[in-house]
Amino acid sequence: MHCPFCRHPDSRVVDSREADEGQAIRRRRSCPECGRRFTTVETAVLAVVKRSGVTEPFSRDKVVKGVRRACQGRDVDDDALNLLAQQVEDAVRAAGSPEIPSNEVGLAILGPLRDLDEVAYLRFASVYRGFSSAEDFEREIAALRAHRDAPAES
């Protein structure tokens, strides 16, 4: 790591700590040349591979925007949407891959959204899964009811 003060090509790590709820590492560094200290923050970049093959950085804001559309007219606040986006990011990061297909991001949204608001879930699932008939909705509603009636896992 280059020193930002004297541009010396090496530095020594003095202290490392988790930051941003475990999503980043904050390091205090010391330059052996000028003796000054500086801080770096390291994060692992998570990339989303779209259907077209284009790669873009994962964006919680994009998740919130997409889910907000499904929640339009529903009693869902911004805090709940931000928490859902965090859950989605945690789930896709847990896969351990630096690149994740966009359809896996959509799948990661479905579970938390179903628990948050069933109507919003149906709206999102109908677009995401490309529902084309009333039967598609009926099947999904039956699956929702089965999930709701299933005993909670302990």
Curated annotation (Swiss-Prot):
Task: Check the record and name the InterPro entries matching this protein.
Answer: ATP-cone_dom (IPR005144), NrdR-like_N (IPR055173), RNR_NrdR-like (IPR003796)
Gene Ontology annotations of biological process type: negative regulation of DNA-templated transcription
Identify the cofactor(s). Zn(2+)
Name all ATP-cone domain ranges.
Answer: 46-136
Instruction: Give residue ranges of zinc fingers (unnamed).
Output: 3-34
Q: How is the cofactor bound?
A: Binds 1 zinc ion.
Any one Gene Ontology MF annotation carried by this entry is:
DNA binding
**Which key words tag this protein in UniProt?**
ATP-binding, DNA-binding, Metal-binding, Nucleotide-binding, Repressor, Transcription, Transcription regulation, Zinc, Zinc-finger
Q: Which PANTHER family does the record associate with it? A: TRANSCRIPTIONAL REPRESSOR NRDR (PTHR30455:SF2)
Which family is it part of?
A: Belongs to the NrdR family.
* Its job: Negatively regulates transcription of bacterial ribonucleotide reductase nrd genes and operons by binding to NrdR-boxes.
Identify this protein by name. Transcriptional repressor NrdR
What organism does the record attribute this protein to? Mycobacteroides abscessus (strain ATCC 19977 / DSM 44196 / CCUG 20993 / CIP 104536 / JCM 13569 / NCTC 13031 / TMC 1543 / L948) (Mycobacterium abscessus)
